Amino acid sequence: MPATGITLPSPSGPPLPCSAAIFVLDHRSRLPWPFPVSPLLFYTAALAFPAISGKNTMTSSANTTSPAIAETTWLTDQRILVLDFGSQYAQLIARRVREQNVYCQIVRHDISAERIAELAPKGIILSGGPNSVYEEGAPKCDEGLFDLGIPVLGICYGMQLACQALGGKVDNTPSREYGRAMCEFTDRDSIFRGMQESEQVWMSHGDQVSQIADQFTAMAKTSTCPYAAIRHNERPVFGMQFHPEVTHTPHGGQILRNFVIDVCGCDGSWKLGDFADAAIESIRKQVGNKRVICGLSGGVDSSVVAALLYKAIGPQLSCILVDNGLLRKNEQQIVLEEFSNHFKTDLHIVEAEDRFLADLAGIDEPQEKRRRIGHAFIECFKDEAAKIEDAHFLAQGTLYPDVIESGADKDGPAATIKLHHNVGGLPEELGFELIEPLRDLFKDEVRRLGLELGLPEQLVWRHPFPGPGLAVRCLGEITRDKLVVLREADAIVVEEIENAGLYRETSQAFAVLLPVQSVGVMGDARTYDNAVAVRCVNTDDFMTADWSHLPYELLARISTRIINEVKGVNRVCYDISSKPPATIEWE
C-alpha cells in the first residue's frame, strides 16, 4: 500500500561511543516474569525448570548457567559487568547501574578472568544466588578476577563467594534475615559515602559470613549479622549482605552510584542518544543496499525498531502486520495511523483471524494456545515475506531481558528458560539475517529511546501487551464471540483510566474474561452470564508488581459501563493480587 507521512530526521555527525558501562556476573537468572513483548512478533513458550532449594532466597530457582551476552562493539569504552549466580534481581542490578548513566552488562558466572581482562570493564558486580557457597557443586567464579585490579562488589551470595575465595568463612545461621532490617554503618567512606549512621536495608539470606580474613575490615552490621558489609584493605574488593538494588533499600541507588562512579571511575556520561547514533550507523554498515523486513504491531518495541531502521535505511524497509484476530480493539487502525504518520515505506497487512481461530478451536490449555499461535504466526509471516523481493534481513524487537532469559549465548552453552518470540523465533529456512538493534536495552530504555527518535508519547507509553495477545486474557477455549466480549470490556477499562488521567500512573491495565458464568438480575429477569476481571498494576520493572489502588468511583464507572454496554456480562471483579504470588497476566 502507498505510505504517506513525515520522514524522521537523519542523525547528524559520526556515532558517539558509549562512555560508561558495568558488568554483572550471572550464575543463571531464572526470572519468574515474561517481559511483555509485541503480540505480532513471536510466541513465548515457558519451559519447565526444576526448582532448587537454596539458602539465599532473593533468587530464582535455576541450577544452570546463564548466557554470556555477546559483546557489542559500540558499548565497550566503559562498562560494568554483572556476574549472575542465579539472582532473580540480576537484571535489576544492571538497570540500577544504568540509571547512573553507566552501561552495564550481565554475563555468566563462570566467565574466565582472561575474557574479563579482554573486555576491560571498569568494575565487576557479583550477584546473589540460591545456593550455599560451601556446598558441593555451588557455582563459583574464576578467582583470578580478584587479581585483575578491577574493583569488585559482591552482593549477598556474591559477597560470601568473594569472602570465601579470599580466606574468610561462610556458615548457615539460625538467625536468618528476610525483609527489612536496620543496618549500622561503621565505615561511611567510599561506597557508603553519604549514608546515615543507621539506615534501612533489605536482607534475604540464611547463610552469612562468620569470619573474615585479616585483610578485610567490617563496614556495617545489623543486630544479627556482624558482617553486613566488608572491604578488602589492599584490593578494591567490597561486599554487602543486603541488596542495594531493590527499592526496599531506600538509598541503595546511592551505594551503587558510589561504587561505579567513585570507586570504578566511570564518568556517568552514557546516553541513549549516543546509543541511537551508533545503532543507526551499525545498521547501515550491516545492511548496505539490501532490504529489511520488520514485524510491526504498534507496540513500543517494534515501533522503535522501525524508527531506527527508517532513519538508517529509509525506503529499504518493509513492514509486515499480521492481524491474528487476537488484538485489542481498533489495533489495526491505530497501527496504520501511527505508521502513516511516521514512516514513508511500504506496509504489508495479513488478515489471518480465521486461520488463527481455527487453529485454536477446542484448545483451553495456555501453553498449547501459545504454541499454536506461534506456529500460525510463523507460517503467516513466512508466506508474506516470500512476496517481498530482495529481502535479506529480518529485524526483531529483541530486548535485553529476552536475550538473558532465552539463553542466547555467543561464548558458550546456556540453558534456555523461555523460548522467546523475539529470540530465534522464525525458522532458519527463511534464510534471513537477523538485526536486533534493541538487544542491549531494557524496556524503560526503549521508551526513552523512542522519545529521542521523535515517536509520539501516546505510542511510546502504551501499556505492554502479551505476545499471544488476548488469547491469554480469554481463559479457557477461545471463540470469536468471547473475543468480542473481551475486546469491548478491555477498551472500556483503558478508556476510563485514560479519562481519569491515570493511564501514565499505572503500568498495565486490562480486562480478563473468566471461564465461568454467574447468576444476576437485569431488569426483572434472571441472567446467567459472563464474569469479567479487571487487572491493573503498578511496577517499576515488571519483576514485582502491586495492584493499583484505583479510586472507588473509577472502579464503579468501569463496572457499570461494562455491565451496561457489553452484552453477555453481568459481573465485574477487581483483581487485588500482587506479584508475587500472582503473575500480572492470568495465563
UniProtKB/Swiss-Prot annotation:
Coiled coil: none annotated. Keywords: ATP-binding, Glutamine amidotransferase, GMP biosynthesis, Ligase, Nucleotide-binding, Purine biosynthesis. The active site is at residues 156, 243, 245. The gene is guaA. The keyword Oxidoreductase does not apply. Residues 270-462 form the GMPS ATP-PPase domain. Catalyzes the synthesis of GMP from XMP. It is an enzyme of class 6 (ligase). SUPFAM superfamilies: Adenine nucleotide alpha hydrolases-like, Class I glutamine amidotransferase-like, GMP synthetase C-terminal dimerisation domain. InterPro entries: Class_I_gatase-like, GATASE, GMP_synth_C, GMP_synth_GATase, GMP_synthase, GMPS_ATP_PPase_dom, NAD/GMP_synthase, Rossmann-like_a/b/a_fold. This is GMP synthase [glutamine-hydrolyzing]. GO terms for molecular function: ATP binding; GMP synthase activity. GO terms for cellular component: cytosol. Homodimer. GO terms for biological process: GMP biosynthetic process. Residues 79-269 form the Glutamine amidotransferase type-1 domain. Pathway: Purine metabolism; GMP biosynthesis; GMP from XMP (L-Gln route): step 1/1. ATP binds at residues 297-303. The lineage of its organism: Bacteria, Pseudomonadati, Planctomycetota, Planctomycetia, Pirellulales. It catalyses: XMP + L-glutamine + ATP + H2O = GMP + L-glutamate + AMP + diphosphate + 2 H(+). Its EC number is 6.3.5.2.
